[in-house]
Amino acid sequence: MIPPTDPRLVDAACAAVRGARRVTVLSGAGLSTDSGIPDFRGPNGVWTRDPAAERASTLACYLAEPEVRRAAWRNRVRWFAREPRPNDGHRAIVALERRGVLRGVVTQNVDGLHQRAGNDPSLVHEVHGSILATRCWGCGERRPMTEALERVAAGDADPPCLACGGILKSDTILFGQSLDEEVMAAALAASEDCDVLLTVGSTLSVYPAANCVPRARAAGARVVIVNGEATEMDHLAEVVLVASLSAVLPAICAA
């Protein structure tokens, strides 16, 4: 359970953002829980409740085990059936862009909700990829996820690439898979070129995305952390706020 929010910490976070000319946001799974998407490591997270699911999130396991792929496709069908929508936390970050102070959004999320809320896609750096597309592990062809899901609905439990017959996966980064170097470089650049790094909904335990925090701090940025629980980077932050993101972000970003 999230403890009562200290209004003094909310005021401190508001003041930090209010005084910034360039704000970079680093977002994690906790931002999207109010959109009905469970996080991974929280008290009710996917991997907390089912540790075996974390093993199934490795690239080696996905490529080697057809049943893991079939289960992944079933999960993707369920994910899209939820029709997740942006929440007040996502919309608060859009408000930063409309104020003209948003340097960029570095997101560990794969749900596309920042763009759907209204953020300029060119400002959103999806370091862990996107579930809205598929990519063939063989030829690299990228296609809309909806095309593959139509094939799953028609009875193909593990649809192969139509171009080469290779293994198809969501265009997301699994454990053991390299990140896109250009996307990560852009994410680090946004973190080093801001007055305030506002991290929201991340435990800051997954690298290299978590490196954005010390890189921003080393470049002179103030770090504000808002999350539903303590993070591994709290010691680097000027303000640490344990709170419901959709409840406090509108005030912080409208400062």
Ranges and model annotations:
Residues 1-255:
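Conserved catalytic core of sirtuin-type NAD+-dependent deacylases
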